[in-house]
Amino acid sequence: MASIRSGLVTLFAAVLVSCSSGSGSSSSGSGNGDLQASIGPIPLKPSEETTVCMVMPLGNTEDVVLDGFDMKLAPGSHHLIAYLTDAGVTAPNTFACSPFTGVVIGTDVPIAFANAEDISFSFPKGVAMDIPANSNIKIEAHYINATANELQGHGQVTFHTAPKASAPPYQAANFLAAGTVDISIPPNSSYSTGPLFASPPAGTHMVIVTTHEHRLGTRAQVWASAKEGDLSHEITDDRNWASPAWRTLSPQIDFDGTNGLTYQCDWTNTTDQTVTFGESALDEMCIIAGYYYPSQGILGCIGHGCKTRQ
C-alpha cells in the first residue's frame, strides 16, 4: 500500500492533476432514516499506535442522500474516516491499513470525518451527498494510546439520510482538502508554514471547514481571501489540535476563480528530534478540510490550484 506521504504528495501535486486481524463492527438502520456503522473494540497496549480498517454493508436498500452525521470516538482515537467503497465486506474482521490513503489514492470516497471525540454535522438546506443503494462503507480508525494503561478503541458513526426519490431539491456535495507536506520542525523550536493560498474552482461553494494537526500543533488558521495575501477575513482559528472546530460557514464561500482560502499551521517542537510530515501521530500534518458543492469529485489543493482526484 502506498505510504501516506507519497499518497499526499500525489494528491496535492500529481494524482489530483489528472493489516492485522481484529474484530468488532456493525452497520444497521434505526428505522428513522438513520444508518449506523461502528468499529471496535480495538485493544491498545500502552504507547501502541495502529490504524485499522473494516468494510461493511451500510444497509441502505435504495438510493439515499446524506444530510449529516454524528461520530463518537473512544479515548485514544486520533481520527476516524468513513468512505463509500467498492471493496468487499470484511466485517466483523478488521485489517491493517494506512491513514488517509483512501482520501489521496484509489476510488474510495470519504463521506464523514472526525478528528475529535464527538462530532455532529448537518449540511445546509439544499446541500447533501449522494449514497447509492446497497453501498458498502469502509471505516478507517487511527488510534494511539499515550497512557500507561490499556485502552479499547471504538468508533461509531450515525449517518442521517433520506430517500433520494422523495428528497427536496439539493446540490450534491463532496470533500475538499488542502495541505502541505513541506514540514520540518527543528528540535526545541517553534515553526510556522506562513500563509498558504489555494483557489478552488470558480462556481463552487464551501460550506464547512475544519483543520488537522498532530500533537505539536499550537495553532491552525484559515481565512476567506479575496485574493492571495488577503488576511482580513478569518474563518477559523484552532488552538487545540486535539479538538478542532467544525465550522459551518454562514455565509458560504463562493469561489470565483480569483478568491480562495489562505491557511497557516504553527507548531512548537518540545522534543529533541526534528519532526517532519508523516502518517504517525508522532509526526506532523497541516491539513484543512471541508465540504463544497456542486461536486466535481474529491478536490485536493496545493499551491494556487485545486484539482480533482482521478
Give a label for each model feature.
Residues 1, 12, 16-32:
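Ser/Thr-rich, Pro/Gly/Ala-heavy low-complexity intrinsically disordered linkers and tails
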Residues 9-10, 231:
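Alpha-helical interaction segments
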Residues 3-8:
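N-terminal export and membrane-targeting signals
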Residues 31-205, 210-310:
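Beta-strand-centric surfaces of beta-sandwich/beta-rich domains
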